[in-house]
């Protein structure tokens, strides 16, 4: 994997910097590195493809070295270099796609394609110029079964989940109380509602709770907590739990009371925040517990009082909500991230070349299914293909 990264980094720099008019002295180190790459690759044959619709391609390396000059690089020099650069880039692209297309239930973090296995051989270790990539560093650690640490911004840690729980219900669905939520990506939105606005609740207060368990623990997380759940702030028709009917939800938004968020790790509370909104920090956690209250306003203007009558029918439904959004965090496991295109790149390659469903990844790389059942085998394979996708993205946009 380190060789693949070094090849890609060298080719990217060569493509960007070996241009007509450039002083040779400004790129002499790069050209020496480029020539070292050619010397190491010359005389070797590779084969890529042969899975799904990814065509079999054979690659032979027999290229001349780039020379030295005392002056600027001229058109002929650059043209000769370009021919070599384009062939190498095409090769790297196909090695990456071949690797992305493959998976294994055992030791899925190791190279799976014939070409990358060959590049991992001892004879190619001289191509090892720059391994500063976060993905390469963590791949090396994972390959040795040591602790990794990926920094994510808006990590897709929550599988998609949208549902409701009714704590009070009737066949007519005209006096309901409960919670509804939408968990997806890096965000949780949860709302507590009571059609009667807590008229018969103890002290006119309804208590709500929402617990979310993560598939992998996060550390040093920066989180935004807001006293609102905008996705549940407008009228909607909702299917009943048994699917036999539908019920009407017409929210009127109140501010939640006694808001508390707890971050737990292995059942132990690590951080707790009470009535604190905006930016909060969570040190280490695998579970989030949100609790909040709906309090019937003790004093109401006539207009507000008309919204929340003492008896049915209840045409407006008192609602309070919270939004919790993970802005950035560190995870020991690789994840999809809204700020990165790695999952999209991997999925696109597998779809474009009709890669058959294998023993590890779900059909279509369905992220909700993948993260819901995030096995060690999936984690290993995902780290490998994401590392390869990050390497490929240096050359192929």
Curated annotation (Swiss-Prot):
Keyword check for Metal-binding: yes
CC annotations in GO: viral envelope; viral intermediate capsid
Protein residues bound to Ca(2+): 266, 286
Pfam families: Rota_Capsid_VP6 (PF00980)
Chain residues that bind Zn(2+): 153
Residues annotated as signal peptide: none
GO molecular function terms attached to this record: host cell surface receptor binding; metal ion binding; structural molecule activity
Localization in the cell: Virion
GO BP annotations, alphabetical order: fusion of virus membrane with host plasma membrane
Xref: InterPro entries: Capsid_hemagglutn (IPR008980), Rotavirus_A/C_VP6 (IPR001385), Virus_capsid_a-hlx_vir (IPR008935)
Main localization category: virion
Domain of life: Viruses
SUPFAM superfamilies from the UniProt entry: A virus capsid protein alpha-helical domain (SSF48345), Viral protein domain (SSF49818)
Post-translational changes noted in the entry: The N-terminus is blocked.
Keywords: Calcium, Capsid protein, Intermediate capsid protein, Metal-binding, Ubl conjugation, Virion, Zinc
Stretches for region Interaction with the inner capsid protein VP2: 62-73
The family this protein is said to belong to: Belongs to the rotavirus VP6 family.
Function: Intermediate capsid protein that self assembles to form an icosahedral capsid with a T=13 symmetry, which consists of 230 trimers of VP6, with channels at each of its five-fold vertices. This capsid constitutes the middle concentric layer of the viral mature particle. The innermost VP2 capsid and the intermediate VP6 capsid remain intact following cell entry to protect the dsRNA from degradation and to prevent unfavorable antiviral responses in the host cell during all the replication cycle of the virus.
Subunit field text: Homotrimer. Interacts with the inner capsid protein VP2. Interacts with the outer capsid glycoprotein VP7. Interacts with the outer capsid protein VP5*.
Protein name, per record: Intermediate capsid protein VP6
Organism annotation: Rotavirus A (strain RVA/Human/Japan/YO/1977/G3P1A[8]) (RV-A)
């Amino acid at each position: 994997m380190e060789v693949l990264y070094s090849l890609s980094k060298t080719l990217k720099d060569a493509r960007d910097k070996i241009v007509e008019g450039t002083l040779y002295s400004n790129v002499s180190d790069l050209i020496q590195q480029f020539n070292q790459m050619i010397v190491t690759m010359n005389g070797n044959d590779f084969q890529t493809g042969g899975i799904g619709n990814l065509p079999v391609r054979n690659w032979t390396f027999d290229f001349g070295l780039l020379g030295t000059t005392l002056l600027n690089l001229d058109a002929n020099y650059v043209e000769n270099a370009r021919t070599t650069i384009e062939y190498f880039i095409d090769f790297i692209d196909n090695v990456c796609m071949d690797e992305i297309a493959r998976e294994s239930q055992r030791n899925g973090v190791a190279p799976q394609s014939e070409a990358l296995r060959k590049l991992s051989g001892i004879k190619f270790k001289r191509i090892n110029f720059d391994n500063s990539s976060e993905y390469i560093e963590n791949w090396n650690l994972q390959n040795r079964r040591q602790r990794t640490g990926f920094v994510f911004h808006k990590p897709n840690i929550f599988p998609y989940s949208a549902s409701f729980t009714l704590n009070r219900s009737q066949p007519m669905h005209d006096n309901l109380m409960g919670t509804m939520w939408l968990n997806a990506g890096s965000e949780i939105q949860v709302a507590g509602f009571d059609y009667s606005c807590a008229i018969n609740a103890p002290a006119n207060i309804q208590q709500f709770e929402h617990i979310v368990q993560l598939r992998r623990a996060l550390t040093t997380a920066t989180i935004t907590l807001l006293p609102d759940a905008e996705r549940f702030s407008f009228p909607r028709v909702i299917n009943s739990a048994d699917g036999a009917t539908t019920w009407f939800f017409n929210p009127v938004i109140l501010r939640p009371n006694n808001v508390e968020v707890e971050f737990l790790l292995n059942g132990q509370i690590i951080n707790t925040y009470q009535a604190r909104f905006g930016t909060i920090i969570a040190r280490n956690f695998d579970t989030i517990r949100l609790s909040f209250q709906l309090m019937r306003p003790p004093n109401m203007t006539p207009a507000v009082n008309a919204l929340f009558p003492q008896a049915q029918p209840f045409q407006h439904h008192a609602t309070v909500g919270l939004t919790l959004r993970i802005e950035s965090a560190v995870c020991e496991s690789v994840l999809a991230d809204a700020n990165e295109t790695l999952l999209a790149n991997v999925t696109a390659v597998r779809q474009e070349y009709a890669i058959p469903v294998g023993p590890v990844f779900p059909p279509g790389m369905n992220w909700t299914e993948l993260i819901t059942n995030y096995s060690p085998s999936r984690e290993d394979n995902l780290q490998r293909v994401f590392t390869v996708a990050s390497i490929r993205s240096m050359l192929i946009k």
